[in-house]
Amino acid sequence: MLQNQSHTLIGVTKTAVFFLYAALAIIGFAIGYFIPQIAKWALSLPWIPLEGPLRLITSFQGSTASFITALLGMCAGIWFAHSVIAMLLSVKITDHTVEFIKGKKVQTIHSDDIALVFMDHKRLVLLGTAGYELVREEIDEKPVNVEKAFRQHHYEWATDGDPFKDQFRRWIPDAPDLSQGAHALLKARHKALQDEEKDDIEEFRLELAQLGIVVRDEGTRQYWRKAETYPPKIQLGEGL
């Protein structure tokens, strides 16, 4: 958690991002530099798959070849770091807005639209003024730090968690409580949960919110409740 007079940053900070890029680039460089020796050692084992490619790697000799494989390894490390960071969440909190930053995506929510903030297991939830969920995102931060950050900027924190938790019901396909449109979205979202398609899971959650349906998950099981009004439009933008 990073804090100054104007804002607090929780989750993945810029410092952590820098060190992740640096560490994986160095590791990739080292592996690339020593890959011919690693391949030679692997070929000494009683059985190893991909023997042909490994023999090709052992044919790389000399300082120039080692430098090229090291650069390739460093590029692979940077690419892997970029892929990891794109899945991690940072939250920038000010007195007036909360920004959810994941990769190049930024979701901005104004403080006037936020009624309550709480943690649901590892997920950070922002509740709107009429009971709808503005955001439900998994965050890599200690709950005590999350609570401290939001209280510091005068947001209402729910120590006991979701005040609507007793209203959630497990989704049953084609049950009469929901419209056909809501069932279609929940069915598609259930498949996305099974396939671990995170973008689709979130997109369907937002579409359900426009129907006045709040949804939460336990594994691939979905639980839902109705909100009193539709959520406001949420500002989306591009990150750094």
Curated annotation (Swiss-Prot):
InterPro entries assigned: CysS_C
Protein name: Uncharacterized protein YqeB
Pfam families associated with the record: bPH_10 (PF23494), CysS_C (PF23493)
One Gene Ontology cellular component: plasma membrane
Organism: Bacillus subtilis (strain 168)
Keywords: Cell membrane, Membrane, Transmembrane, Transmembrane helix
Cellular compartment(s): Cell membrane
TM region positions: 16-36, 67-87
UniProt topology in membrane: Multi-pass membrane protein
Keyword Phosphoprotein among UniProt keywords: no
